[in-house]
């Protein structure tokens, strides 16, 4: 069976998703510049404006150690954003080479993040402090 959830805003365009260990779904809302949270058990949805604003175009996203990490692809340079799930606070860092639209991110087995910098012919490793 396929179950679909309609997001709260008709202009939402989720590009990528990340799933936490407790099966909560987070999505990068590319068109509106938001991070969204969907609880598939209850259908509850909550959204936060991305730090880079409505034109930040969140794209690649992953979960690591109690936080959602994603990239804002329309900022120059692209930024890496971290959203702490307990405090609901954001942190951001500029991507040194610019990012070039990070469309995909993954968590490594040793607790770091790998990003595909698709317009720059680069792959980046983000070493996450413990």
At which residue positions do the language-model features occur?
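Short loop/turn segments that connect beta-strands within beta-propeller blades
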Residues: 1, 39-43, 84-88, 127-130
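Beta-propeller fold detector
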Residues: 3-7, 46-50, 91-95
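Beta-rich, blade/repeat-based domains predominating
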Residues: 9-24, 53-66, 71, 98-110
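A generic "binding-loop/recognition-motif" signal
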Residues: 10, 31, 41, 54, ...
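Residue-level signal for WD-repeat beta-propeller blades
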Residues: 19, 29, 39, 62-63, ...
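Conserved beta-strand positions in repeat-built beta-propeller and related beta-rich domains
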Residues: 25-31, 68-75, 115-119
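A short loop-to-beta-strand structural motif that recurs across blades of beta-propeller domains
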Residues: 34-37, 78-81, 122-125
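Blade-level signature of beta-propeller repeat domains, shared across WD40, Kelch, NHL, RCC1
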Residues: 99-130
């Amino acid at each position: 069976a396929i179950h679909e959830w309609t997001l709260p805003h008709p202009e939402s365009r989720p590009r990528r998703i990340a799933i936490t260990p407790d099966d909560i779904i987070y999505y990068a809302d590319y068109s509106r510049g938001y991070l969204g949270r969907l609880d598939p058990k209850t259908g509850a949805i909550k959204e936060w404006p991305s730090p880079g604003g409505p034109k930040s175009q969140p794209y690649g996203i992953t979960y690591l150690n109690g936080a959602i990490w994603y990239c804002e692809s329309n900022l120059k340079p692209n930024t890496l954003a971290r959203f702490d799930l307990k405090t609901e606070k954001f942190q951001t860092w500029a991507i040194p080479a610019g990012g070039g639209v990070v469309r995909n991110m993954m968590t490594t087995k040793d607790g770091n993040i790998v990003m595909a910098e698709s317009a720059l012919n680069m792959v980046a490793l983000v070493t996450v402090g413990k």
